[in-house]
Amino acid sequence: MVSYLFVLGALASVAIASPVPELKARASCTFTDAASAIKGKASCTTIVLNNIAVPAGTTLDMTGLKSGTHVSFSGKTTFGYKEWEGPLISFSGSNVVIDGASGHSIDCQGSRWWDSKGGNGGKTKPKFFYAHSLKDSTIRGLHTLNTPVQAFSINGAANLGVYDVSVDNSAGDSAGGHNTDAFDVGSSTGVYISGADVKNQDDCLAVNSGTNITFTGGTCSGGHGLSIGSVGGRKDNVVKSVSITNSKIINSDNGVRIKTVAGATGPVSDITYSGITLSNIAKYGIVIEQDYENGSPTGKPTSGVPISGLTLSKISGSVSSSATPVYILCASCTNWKWSGVSVTGGKKSSKCTGIPSGSGAAC
């Protein structure tokens, strides 16, 4: 169902002979079901999605919104169960604001799909949220629970700000959650993610391609860390000017991670990690490797995706006793600058190779 409130506004002319401007209606709409929201979105510039129960196999399709539209999630948003690829929610448009009202939640109830296989088999699981072709837009304060697999897919976006978003998949730690990436960024420019709070079982952030990407003030727990890549093997394989700062990585497999695809091409350049705190990292505190093939390392780095202009500063914390503090496997790595890097615990690697001389980097 939907309710409309039309607000009429006009500009008055001060000149006696000037014509009266045309009145334009702008609608504020509250939707309580997905079908009405999808059908009525084009008539509204303020949209409230109130306690929406999205039917199984349906995308809550908020694509093609009018410029300047404000969409707010209110109450509890849920989704019916079906094995399909999704997405559960999709947005596109320019100058769009997407936010959550106080006390709202978007609960995917992912345990219905979780089987410890993620996107690698088992049940077909829907991705959660496509932020595709969002331009000059903002996502703020969304509270997301239990995504079946990946949460936010940011692709083809430009000048997108993502503020104070939480992704809580902590229930998946013991219930088979897998491949529950929080933010996957591809083919985008000017993406700014601030204040994210993530509990999941995969990358907190994965930048696969894009320029001018920032992640700052985040907390990442339970997953695979803050990642560049894997880079290579896609249509767009350029990663440039990425800044990851002032964030915490807790109880995760990895901390800082950069991985490129063996035999592929495409540059990774001007990457900064600064002010990163690590705690109880299970596998690698810092891992940089150019040897990924079919999603797994081969131990044989290739040079087709060079990593240049990598700055690490003020990276501190600890790894578990069985973990590796720093692991670097490079075939083409240049112009690095590391300072204030102190990762303690674990066992040092004796297999590092290709570290740029004079960079300050060490295993």
From Swiss-Prot:
Top EC category: hydrolase
GO biological process: cell wall organization; pectin catabolic process
Active site: D202, H224
Localization (cell): Secreted
Signal peptide (from-to): 1-17
Propeptide part(s) removed at maturation, as residue ranges: 18-26
Keywords: Cell wall biogenesis/degradation, Disulfide bond, Glycoprotein, Glycosidase, Hydrolase, Repeat, Secreted, Signal, Zymogen
Annotated protein name in UniProt: Endopolygalacturonase 1
